[in-house]
């Protein structure tokens, strides 16, 4: 290509082509009908709220109910998908707090190994709630362990 040469981009579709179905967000049923689960699908979507990472010097804990995951699971259930929730912070009884190897953070909740044990073998999508960037170092290790044990799982992370 020469410096003065103009590149003309020609789209492969016409601008008036209706290739995206318009959905009315005010009507959940019409929206869900576009995303319904395949019939007799035994696969599972697992949603996880991992353990909480708390700075050692913190006097408060950001532990809250995983309402976001509950909302997502509710919509997926309504669309016909099989869902499971792992609340790694709320499921651990009695509550145990562990210190990280660098002695800077406390971890509250199930360990990575305990989370791995709770993942349904039929899981094809694993959604993980990553609310705070300060937790990324610990949750990344969890994601790596999940991918190693279940290499075909699609992992979706969000906050």
Show the residue positions of the predicted features.
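A short, structured N-terminal alpha-helical element that caps or precedes a catalytic domain
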Residues: 1-158
